[in-house]
Structure formats: C-alpha cells, structure tokens
C-alpha cells in the first residue's frame, strides 16, 4: 500500500481502461497487509480517484512471528514491520505465533460498515504452511 506514488495512479488508470476496452478481468492483488484501517482508506482513495477495480487483500496466514518478520524483510514490506514491532515490542513475544484474526476482524467490520468499497476477497500467504492455515480456517 505504501508503494511509490510516481506513476501509480496512471498505471491503475491504464489497468481500469484496459479492463473496460478488452473486457479483461483485472483484479488488484496486494502483498500481505497488517493495518485494516490503512487498507480501507487506500481502497476508498482509489474509488474517489475513479479506480473501481476489485481488490483482493493479502493476509499473512498463521505462522511463527520470526518467520513472518523474515518474509516481511524479504518482500520489502517495510511499513508493515513497524506494525509488527508495535504489537510485539519485546523479545519474548518474538517467540510467539502470529495470527491474522485481529486484522481479519478489523477488515471485516470496516468493509461491512462501508459496503460501497471495492475490497472483494482476501487471499492468504501460507507462511506457516498450508496445513496450519487449513487447520486454523477450515
């Protein structure tokens, strides 16, 4: 969500126009996110600027916090690391597991409160493994 703004609006406008001209189904798919408020604000700002493409929000599945931090660094999800630091501020908490439940609850309530948004689905990054993800959300 914190992507460079240079050319971003033009790129998204091109994708929207392309989808209308070609009838191609274009979906905006995000990296894994941690802040539902920022996600919904971003989605609303897109709508205000005329970008009404459907959005699928990336969600980090249940995993060890150290694994999640590794993927965050590897994927360049810098601002998201700050959120993790704020929620897991001491070293002892680094040994715990991460669950996306709070993020999903917040995202749910924010999107249900504003049904005129373009967030359609979430997709999971199974950093803790497919089995763990399915056991948690099956």
Language-model region placement:
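Alpha-helix-loop-beta-strand connector modules within alpha/beta enzyme cores
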Residues: 42-56, 135-138
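Active-site-adjacent beta->alpha loops and helix N-cap segments on the catalytic face
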Residues: 3-6, 32-47, 129-133
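Conserved thiamine diphosphate
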Residues: 14-29
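Short, well-ordered coil/turn segments that N-cap beta-strands
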Residues: 23-26, 51-55, 118-120
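Catalytic beta/alpha-barrel core
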Residues: 26-35, 58, 123-125
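C-terminal/domain-terminus segments
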Residues: 115-117, 121-138
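Active-site pocket-lining/capping segments in soluble small-molecule metabolic enzymes
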Residues: 1-17, 48-112, 128
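Generic hydrophobic, helix-prone segments enriched in Leu/Val/Ile
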Residues: 24, 80-84, 136
């Amino acid at each position: 969500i914190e992507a460079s703004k240079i050319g971003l609006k033009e790129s998204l406008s091109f994708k929207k126009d392309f989808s209308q001209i070609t009838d191609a189904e274009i979906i905006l798919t995000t990296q894994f996110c941690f802040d539902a408020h920022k996600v919904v604000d971003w989605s609303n700002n897109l709508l205000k600027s005329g970008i009404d493409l459907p959005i699928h929000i990336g969600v980090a599945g249940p995993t060890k916090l150290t694994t999640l931090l590794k993927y965050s660094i590897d994927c360049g999800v810098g601002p998201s690391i700050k959120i993790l630091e704020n929620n897991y501020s001491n070293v002892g908490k680094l040994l715990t597991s991460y669950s996306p439940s709070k993020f999903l609850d917040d995202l749910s309530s924010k999107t249900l409160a504003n049904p005129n948004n373009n967030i359609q689905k979430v997709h999971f990054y199974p950093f803790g493994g497919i089995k763990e993800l399915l056991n948690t959300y099956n």
